[in-house]
């Protein structure tokens, strides 16, 4: 037979998309063993196979007879023939289909079983198991997306009027709360959308990957609770719930309005700590944000008789919130600002590390001018960071607020206070709860400063008592305290008091006049005294004490509490301890005042007695 030297035939991949690499491998092996010599092509017989199958047959017949190679080639040909028959059969079925539903059914069956026959029982069980398993994996890995998808389906299938009429979402929320300890039949959950036909009260928020709840109203007559939420964003995670961290992870609340009984709220949070289902939902919240909210806090059960406390939250951002560490997590907030009866308060973290680094750098600059500041900055920063890592200081400041607003005189602790203003400044050092320390070593240090102004007192009928009913001081011990506070205002600066009253009177006259003008005058000492020479008031105090804040009493105290005791369930014990510390400091101030008055009286009496003896002595000599 004539042997011809030809080029190696190249079989392109599009001709044999499934098994072309096997044919190419066999061709290259044969050509390598025969030094590039191949047999001439044999004219294929007529067949109905497509061109690519005929080409494959032609190249396969050019190889020598080998049992192993022949078996592999026959298998390849069988696979190609079967796939070609399946493709032609699928095309014929799709051509006979009349509508989209039949074509979708054919394509779905072809993907699952590569045929158009009915599903067998084994195939149905396999498909169902894979479908359920995929939904479970989706629910665990991305719970928020899973719930958002089904909310989208419900909102698309049903009209909003039908959802509001049947109260589908209200029933869903009440079903989630039905097994809680404090939940009862009096709890009302409603939605108040502006347009019931178009507004989605419960819908997915795809941009923030959260669940959006709009216009939610919660009311409970027994708990004296009536709150309205503009909208809430929730993130849920079944993975965290399985790990025991709670189902709800992130919460963003915007626009809370309503009233709330403070004592009932504290009891409600305390009861949640022993509720297993509540802990499963709200055990640990990673990120909590509250913005633009205003709540009227009722501080007693007889809320209709006592005025409410307007508590506004401008911005609150918590890295986490735990029911068993509610107070410490609030004090660990990133930002917390608001107002209490229009008196601003702010909670912020102090920059201890930066201050310490600056102080160390200043000391080193003064010590030596030839100093490498860069290396020392890094060393100081590492040192300070290592020292202050487990602890951080938070400052809480509340501007001057009326005592009647805080209800200091409402309970039995300060029942002798009648009126006045108070400013609170507290530096709180909290041990980092994530540090590797035992629970006994985690503590909180509170350095409290209370500034009282314009206090007015009255003598009570009963002595002040703590929340446990124990007496703080007796009525006899309370008398010097009341005497000191009542005499402190007139004793501190009587001339300034009269001057400030005259100034307020003058300003009131100017303000009531139709021609109003604002004159900003620079404060300075008066060139001439405004008091007549025959006045009995002392002018020296007017020059020595020009400030009008002389009528202020500053109380300081420090308190150390374990983080395990810093809970809402122990809030009365914490307030009792702060009250006792304030009474101790106030008693010291009164004792110093009595000692000073006694010394002044003794000096004045001694001077008067000596002068009288001197005068009588001179008179006797004359």
From Swiss-Prot:
The annotated topology with respect to the bilayer is: Multi-pass membrane protein
The residue spans the entry assigns to the Mitochondrial matrix side of the membrane are as follows 71-123
Q: Name one GO biological process term.
A: mitochondrion inheritance
Q: Does the keyword Cell inner membrane apply?
A: no
Compartments in which it is found = Mitochondrion inner membrane
Which positions, given as ranges, span the membrane?
124-144, 602-622
Mitochondrial intermembrane-side segments = 145-601
Tell whether Transit peptide is among the UniProt keywords: yes
Name the keywords, alphabetized: Membrane, Mitochondrion, Mitochondrion inner membrane, Transit peptide, Transmembrane, Transmembrane helix
GO annotations of cellular component type: mitochondrial inner membrane; mitochondrion
In the UniProt record, the transit peptide is located at: 1-70
Major place of localization? mitochondrion
The protein's matches in InterPro entries, at most eight in alphabetical order, are given as:
Mdm31/Mdm32
Q: Which family does it belong to?
A: Belongs to the MDM31/MDM32 family.
- Misc remark: Present with 10400 molecules/cell in log phase SD medium.
The record describes the protein's role as: Involved in the organization of the mitochondrial membranes and the global structure of the mitochondria. Also required for mitochondrial distribution and mobility as well as for the maintenance of mitochondrial DNA nucleoids structures.
Share what the entry says about its subunit structure, partners included.
Interacts with MDM31. Participates in a complex of about 175 kDa.
Name of protein: Mitochondrial distribution and morphology protein 32
Q: Which gene encodes it?
A: MDM32
């Amino acid at each position: 037979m004539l042997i011809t030297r030809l080029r190696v035939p190249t079989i392109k991949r599009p001709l044999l998309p499934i098994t072309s690499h096997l044919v190419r491998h066999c061709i290259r092996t044969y050509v390598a063993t025969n030094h590039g010599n191949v047999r001439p092509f044999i004219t294929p017989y007529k067949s109905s196979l497509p061109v690519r199958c005929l080409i494959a047959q032609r190249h396969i017949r050019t190889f020598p007879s080998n049992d192993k190679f022949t078996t592999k080639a026959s298998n390849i040909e069988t696979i190609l023939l079967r796939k070609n028959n399946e493709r032609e059969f699928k095309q014929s079925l799709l051509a006979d289909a009349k509508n989209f539903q039949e074509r979708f059914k054919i394509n779905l069956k072809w993907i699952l079983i590569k045929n158009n026959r009915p599903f067998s029982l084994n195939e149905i069980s396999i498909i169902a198991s894979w479908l359920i398993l995929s939904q479970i994996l989706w629910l665990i890995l991305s719970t928020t997306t899973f719930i958002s998808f089904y909310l989208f389906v419900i909102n698309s299938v049903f009209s909003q009027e039908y959802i509001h009429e049947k109260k589908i979402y209200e029933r869903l929320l009440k079903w989630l709360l039905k097994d809680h300890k404090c939940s009862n039949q009096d709890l009302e959950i409603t939605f108040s959308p502006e347009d019931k036909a178009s507004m989605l009260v419960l819908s997915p928020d795809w941009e923030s990957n959260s669940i959006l709840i709009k216009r939610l109203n919660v009311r409970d007559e027994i708990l004296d609770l009536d709150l309205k939420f503009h909208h809430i964003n929730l993130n849920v995670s079944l993975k965290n719930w399985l790990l025991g961290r709670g189902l709800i992870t992130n919460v963003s609340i915007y626009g809370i309005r309503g009233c709330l009984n403070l004592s009932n709220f504290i009891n409600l949070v305390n009861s949640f700590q022993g509720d297993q289902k509540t802990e499963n939902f709200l055990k640990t919240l990673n990120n909590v944000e509250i913005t633009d909210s205003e709540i009227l806090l009722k501080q007693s059960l007889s809320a209709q008789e006592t005025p409410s406390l307007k508590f506004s939250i401008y911005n609150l951002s918590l890295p986490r919130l735990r029911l068993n560490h509610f107070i410490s997590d609030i004090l660990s907030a990133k930002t917390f600002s608001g107002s209490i009866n229009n008196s601003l308060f702010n909670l912020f973290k102090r920059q201890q590390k930066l201050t310490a680094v600056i102080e160390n750098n200043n000391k080193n600059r003064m010590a030596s001018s030839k100093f490498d500041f860069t290396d020392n900055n890094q060393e100081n920063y590492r040192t300070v960071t290592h020292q202050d890592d487990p602890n951080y200081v938070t400052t809480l400041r509340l501007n001057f607020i009326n005592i009647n607003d805080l209800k200091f005189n409402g309970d039995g602790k300060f029942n002798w206070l009648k009126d006045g203003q108070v400013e609170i400044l507290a530096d709180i050092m909290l041990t980092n709860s994530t540090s590797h320390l035992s629970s006994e070593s985690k503590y909180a240090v509170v350095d409290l400063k209370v500034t009282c102004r314009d206090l007015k007192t009255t003598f009570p009928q009963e002595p002040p008592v703590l929340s446990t009913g124990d007496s703080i001081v007796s009525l006899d011990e309370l008398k010097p305290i009341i005497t000191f506070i009542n005499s402190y205002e007139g004793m501190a600066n009587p001339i300034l008091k009269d001057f400030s009253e005259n100034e307020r009177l003058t300003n009131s006259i100017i303000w009531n006049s139709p021609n109003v003008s604002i004159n900003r005058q620079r404060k300075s000492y008066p060139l001439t005294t405004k008091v007549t020479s025959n006045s009995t008031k002392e002018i020296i105090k007017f020059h020595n004490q020009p400030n009008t804040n002389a009528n202020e009493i500053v109380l300081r105290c420090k308190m150390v509490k374990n983080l395990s005791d810093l809970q809402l369930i122990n809030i009365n014990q914490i307030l009792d301890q702060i009250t006792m510390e304030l009474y101790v400091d106030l008693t010291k101030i009164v004792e110093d005042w009595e000692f000073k008055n006694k010394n002044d009286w003794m000096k004045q009496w001694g001077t008067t007695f000596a002068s009288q003896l001197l005068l009588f002595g001179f008179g006797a000599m004359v």
